[in-house]
Amino acid sequence: MRIGASDLDVCRMGLGGNVFGWTADESTSFEVLDAYLHAGGNLIDTADGYSYWAPGNSGGESETVIGSWLASRPARDRIVLATKVSTKPDRPGLSTDNIRLALE
């Protein structure tokens, strides 16, 4: 499925990464990501705020796990990665500063 007028072609079912680094540890997350890729999936969704709400987490755990997975697999050119800017208690709203911090 083509996204708008872009040259991005994604499968109809994306994989949400909100559990990676939280209820799914890195090993389990890698297994899920491998299975999704093997089944023909190519659209992975995440956000910088994923799992900040879990004890011991600060947000970004999902992005970190997905980044580690991408670095360890020859699949980067086959994946479309979608992310979002989140608000967290210490970073409310969508100010320029919050967006800049989320990108880092």
Region annotations inferred by a language model:
Residues 87-104:
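Glycine/proline-rich, positively charged
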Residues 77-89:
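A short, structured active-site edge motif that brings together acidic residues
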Residues 1-80:
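N-terminal binding-site loop/beta-alpha segment at the start of enzyme catalytic domains
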